Amino acid sequence: MNDVLTTRVAALQVDTCIGDTQYNLARCKALVEDACQAGAQWIALPEFFNTGVSWQPSLVNAIEDENGPSAQLLQSLSSQHKVVLGGSFLCRLADGSVRNRYQCYNRGELVGHHDKDLPTMWESAFYEGGDAGDTGELGVIDGVRVGTAVCWEFLRTATSRRLRGKVDVIIGGSHWWSIPENWPVLYSWLEPANRENSLKTVQDTARLVGAPIIHASHCNDFSCPMPGLPLTYRGHLEGQAAVIDGQGKLIAHRTYEQGPGVVLAEICMQEIEPAAPVPDRFWLRRRGLIPAFSWHLHGVLGRRWYKQNVKGRQPSVATVEAPAQ
């Protein structure tokens, strides 16, 4: 019988305090170290691992450059523990624009980066989408072709088209909001489908690309104003940190209710024949009534606010330091 070569990987689930970079980096560092102690060689942190995102204008002051404290944490932990480590953060470029940038390091060396293609809902207030030529391919590690995707990129068919046939593994993560809990009846009606989407879209992408996915996430409760509406959002981030194989099968998983922690699994870092063609449509799944409404309303309001308050602004002097190694 032939032995199948596998790699131990970890997807991290973080209880994030939105906007508190110092706290979040310390929590991420602790989880990375837990994963390393458990033998993980590849470790995924989620989208916005350093700050989280909500409609909180002060987040502008937490935007870093590509060599800021959050990138330094990724690099130093990857180097110290000799692992592959990735995550995304709000990153200001030299031209003054801001991107949601995913960086991946191998043993302390930058493998590559990817800027999320389109901001989701009120994220539009803090960054703009990546360049059209950015496929999400990060590079090659020991012969393994590595790609990434974050959050609603898993919901768009374009992501599967970009990565199909080009990667052996996808390392990424999400920052996926629940339906507002303000109205219990509406929440109980709409939230099950939203929560299902937050995991099934990742499984669908794995199946359509034919590559395993290491998917990190957040699981915190939070509230914030709703842009353009006289309401306060009260809800949570969905959790769903997971390791998924190239057939879309769930190997290991952590729910919102299970809180922060490490999802560990052994996977084969190798592309397989995709299970189905990529659907000929924009969205992989129906978004649901409230997410679709928010996509349009908060996208318009957010883009306007970004142009007026974020784009072109000079980076503030960093007052946050990466946790001591």
Predicted features along the sequence, with ranges:
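Short polar catalytic/cofactor-binding loops
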Residues: 13-18
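Cys-nucleophile CN-hydrolase/nitrilase-fold catalytic domain and related Cys-dependent amidase chemistry
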Residues: 21, 25, 29-111, 176-211
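Hydrophobic residues at beta-strand termini and immediately following loops
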Residues: 12, 114, 139, 216, ...
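C-terminal beta-strand edge segments of enzyme domains
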Residues: 211-212, 217-325
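Short beta-strand scaffold segments in enzyme catalytic cores
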Residues: 87-89, 100-104, 137, 241-243, ...
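CN hydrolase (nitrilase-like) catalytic-core segments centered on the catalytic cysteine
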Residues: 66-86, 155-261
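Active-site catalytic loop in hydrolytic enzyme cores
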Residues: 66, 92-200, 257, 274, ...
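Extreme N-terminal starter segment of soluble prokaryotic enzymes
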Residues: 4-11
